[in-house]
Every structure is written in C-alpha cells, then in structure tokens.
Amino acid sequence: MNAPMNVLLPDALVMAAIIVAWLNDTFTGAAGRRLTYLIAVVASVVAGVWFAVQALDPHQYYFFSRMVVVDSFASMMKAVVSFGFAVTFVYSRKYLEDRDMFRGDVFLLGMFSLLGQLVMVSGNNFLTLYLGLELMSLSLYAVIALRRDAAQSSEAAMKYYVLGALASGFVLYGISMLYGATGSLELGEVYKAVSGNTDAAVLMFGVIFIVAGIAFKLGAVPFHMWVPDVYQGAPTAMTLFVGGGPKVAAFAWGLRFLVMGLLPLAQNWQTALVILAALSLIVGNITGIVQRNIKRMLAYSAISNMGFVLLGLLAGIVKGDAAAPANAYSSAMFYAIVYLITTLGSFGVVMLLARRDFEAETIDDFKGLNKRSPVFAFVMMVMMFSLAGIPPTVGFYAKLAVLEATVNAGLTWLAVLAVITSLFGAFYYLRIVKLMYFDAPQDASPITGDFCKRTILVVNGLAVVALGLVPSPLLTACLQAIRHTLQTLPL
C-alpha cells in the first residue's frame, strides 16, 4: 500500500525532541535541566498518544525500501514503550534530584534508548533490527555508568556492556549466516527463502545465534547472568530504564525475527524456546526465594516472567505448523504489556521509599509500610499480587492466557511446570505483602514524593486492578494487532 510519510511523524517527533533537548542542555547547562526533563516527558506522552491512534489503522506501510514497517503491532508496541518511558521519567525525577543525577544526559540517553526501541519494533530488515538494538543497548550501557563515583554502578555497567557486546556479536553473526544462506536481509524475502530448499545446516546455526541474542535481551536462562547484578548494582532509576520498556521492545524484536522472518523454521527454534522458557521459569522462581535485596528479587522475577513471554512465542506452533498463532502471540504481547505496567509500579514504590541518604534495597525496608502509607502499601500489594498471578489483578489473566495457548499447542507438561514454579514464585511476592501489613516498621519517617509521582503511582495501581476486572479491551487490541501483522504471511 502507498505509504504516506505522515505515518512516521510520531517517530520524527521523538527525534526532534532529542535534538531540541540536546541543544537546550548544551547551551543552558544546569539552568535548563528541568526543561530537558519536560521535553522528554511531553514528547514521550504525545508520541505515545499518536502511536495509539495509529494502532487503529489495520493497514501495513513500508518505508525506505521496505526496511521499516508500520502496522498495528508496531504502533501499539511503540505506544506502550513511549508511555512506559514517560512514566519512568516521572518516577525517577525526585530520586535523581536527591542524588545529584538530575542531568540532561540522563534524559537524552533515555530518549535515545526510546528511539532505538521504536526502530526495533518497526524493523522489517535484519540491519534495521540490529541498528535499533544497538541504539537502545549503547544508550542503556551509558546511562547505567553515569554514576561514576559508585563502584557498584561501574561494575554493573561493565558487566552489562561486556555481555551485551557478546550478545550483539551473536546476533550479527547469526544475521550474516542467514544472509549467506538466503541472499536477503528483508524479513519477507528471508521467509520465502527459508521455505524453499536452502542450506539447512547454515540456517540452523544462524537461528541458534539469533535465539541466543533474543534470550540475552529478554534475560532468559542461561543468558541471564547480567540481570541480577545490573538490577542490584545500578541506581534504582537506571534499573527501571533497563527493566521496563526494553523488555517489551525485546519481545517485539524477537517476534519480528522469529515469526515474520523465520517462521518456516519454527520446529527448530520452538525447541530452543522450550528449553529457555523451562529453565527461566525454574531458575527465576526458585532462586528468587532466597533473595533479601528487593531489586535482586525483582530481577529474578523478571527472569521468570520472561519465561512466560517465551511460552507465548513458542505456543503458536504445533508439530512444526502454525496453529492458532494469533491467539498465542497475542497472549505473549498481552503478557509483555502487563509485565511493563507492574514493573513500573513496583519500582515506583521502591523509589518512593528512597531518600537522599537512604536506598530502599532490602525487603526489610518494606516492613510496616501499611502504617506509614496505607495507599502505597496497597499499590505495592497490587503489584505483588499481579506478578504472582493472583486474581482479580491483570497478572492472573496474563498468565491464564499464556497457559491456555501453551496447552492448545500440545505442551501441557510445560504449562504444568509453569504453574508449579509460579507457586514457588508466589512465596517471595507474598512475603513482601506480609512484611508490609504484619510487621512493625523499622523507620517511622513519612513517605515523601512530589504530587505528580504519587498521583501516577496510584493510577498505576488502579490500572492493574481495572485491567484485571475488565481485561477484554486490551486482550482484544493485542489480538487485532497480531492478526493485522500476520495477514501478510501464508499461514
């Protein structure tokens, strides 16, 4: 279909905001930091609304020699990551101010990371997908390392950089092998090539390296080594930069690679995803039980939740053939969005408890939170219930949708494993609730925070409950977006 260039205007808005914020930060210095912050937040919100409106358009548009695609799936994912970054900026403001880190480069790097995610979501070419990945990754490496006076931050940044560079090398090597075997970098052409008589051995090696790169970006076992150390070592605000929107973008990136380009090889990569998902569910849920550091606990929570996302990705295939793929992939998409919402709320409360000379890092810091602030204790309880998959929170329906897709794919044993390991994981989520409501507070100081942050945090908590009571609108939106994207494939 003819592609009107105005479809790219929200992406251009983000790029323009980066340029304006960069110029403002360069020429005004410390005096203009608040304006840089406002530019980042407003641009993210406006772009998010624009993307959400675009998601209603069922057509697919291609740009730049089919290197970029804009469809319902891309627009919806872009809206989610844009809103996610806006909320991340708001939650982080006071935390950064208290630590003298409220600087323009933090928000500029965040915006560059957002731009990379927008490219990842809309990539229709191996090179475009890789460039988006690198733009996001390099920005995140830098933002974690900004606090140079903290040894833990520097160590976390170094680990993330070294392992991230290794994963990027895997992806690039896999792309080179797939290009050599198919003669094309465009996803549609690769799809056609691998459907024919292409060198199976070369394709297999290429797929293995691609899957390894996807697993690293999602933080799936055994490529999860960086996740607990980076979550714990980085400042909490930077942890949210890494653990929020990038996870959603990584899911969309993986779906573009595996489904839009390599679906004919699904019988091969499904086996790899089964192993990754099973290991992630086991390691994430069981290891999280022994964690006393709240950020490290949430890191293992992220690992186990990415196991559920992988379940949705692999459940679209039955015995090597596409079977009800829209339901399976939409369940993974729904789960990724729900995970972002609950992660934002969880880290929002963690940062709310932090002060200038105090980091809320251990689970004991949540003791008696209900006595200090019943509202935010309730918000944290809702987030923990959602992560544990307890009704009526939206996390329950997210897990249920993925498990249903997994059973329909004939992988009942994997669904049973997911349920059993989730019961282990529920222990450390409910332990936080127990500490907040049944233990005496260690610190009686009042909970402080600006009005905007407190308001959005309450809305965040209410959204988790509201989506749990009425999940069908979001589920339907995910299903329609996936259907519109898959309509070009000969399923």
Show where each model-derived region lies.
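Alpha-helical transmembrane segments of multi-pass membrane proteins predominantly involved
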Residues: M1-L491
